[in-house]
Amino acid sequence: MSGNTYGKLFTVTSAGESHGPALVAIVDGCPPGLELSAQDLQRDLDRRKPGTSRHTTQRQEADEVEILSGVFEGRTTGTPIGLLIRNTDQKSKDYSAIKDLFRPAHADYTYHHKYGVRDYRGGGRSSARETAMRVAAGAIAKKYLAGLGIRVRGYMSQLGPIEIPFKTWDSVERNAFFSPDPDKVPELEAYMDQLRRDQDSIGAKITVVAEGVPPGLGEPIFDRLDAELAHALMSINAVKGVEIGAGFASIAQRGTEHRDELTPQGFLSNNAGGILGGISSGQPIVAHLALKPTSSITTPGRSIDTAGEPVDMITKGRHDPCVGIRATPIAEAMMAIVLLDQLLRQRGQNADVRVDTPILPQL
């Protein structure tokens, strides 16, 4: 069965290719009565769109979203919300010379074997261009969650060898890297400038945090909250790893260090990333994403053609030297979609559950 839909109650179905006429999405299950306009979605789309700095692809797409259905007089109706973003700056001729070649580390080879036919222009459906619809859908989820006091935010925590310490959220929206440390921006810019001169690319690490999440979200056993987050975040193009909380660092931790002890004043740590037993604890939800270097570089590489013959590949076109630079809004969107879906599932089964134990504050 095709995998173009995510969610159980709050569902997102997307369609469209990198060089097709448009991208579309159907968002179903959004509760009625939410005030919603195209501008609510456009804010996050503008954070993701290409061509916003010299460090990203120079493809110029306005990414202007149209709401086709599901909203009447400025409020959601509870019916499916149709979204559309038109592609306006395709240069398909850049790919005509490689239509019978497989770009190394791209999805060309695997799409060819899976479907027997593929849209070679810019990667077609496998292109990160598709993530624009995730961001649009995620903006709907973020707005609904915000009305409940839940805020989802992200930032870049590492670019290549450069680790970026968290200093302030205020810095994140003031630079092209979503860096929480303004003092690191000149170093990041210099690194990217040299990378472009080297005709190479680099990976990155993104951290995404949800605050205000109540205890109880997550559906053990198979739909645990951390499992659903890993599923959603790993579905983002170029993501090769996901950590929740301390993640792989917990391998070197002792139990006395890793366990998040409880006091009447709150948890003393958050190594679990806000999730215990697959269920939200009320602490901030923290996830980290590892994104690989983009494979579209002008440095020649070995590959084969559709006949299996060896070729030397030089990938032309307009590409991101670091896909992680624009990944923060995408990661936020996917976390928000997961949280709203889990919130609606919790509401559907356990809305009447009441316990006397107080909810511990976030530290």
UniProtKB/Swiss-Prot annotation:
Its EC number is 4.2.3.5. SUPFAM superfamilies: Chorismate synthase, AroC. NADP(+) binds at residues 48, 54. One of its GO terms (biological process) is chorismate biosynthetic process. Its cofactor is FMNH2. GO terms for molecular function: chorismate synthase activity; FMN binding. FMN binds at residues 125-127, 237-238, 277, 292-296, 318. Keywords: Amino-acid biosynthesis, Aromatic amino acid biosynthesis, FAD, Flavoprotein, FMN, Lyase, NADP. The keyword Flavoprotein applies. InterPro entries: Chorismate_synth, Chorismate_synth_AroC_sf, Chorismate_synthase_CS. Homotetramer. Belongs to the chorismate synthase family. PANTHER family: CHORISMATE SYNTHASE. This is Chorismate synthase. It comes from Pseudomonas paraeruginosa (strain DSM 24068 / PA7) (Pseudomonas aeruginosa (strain PA7)).
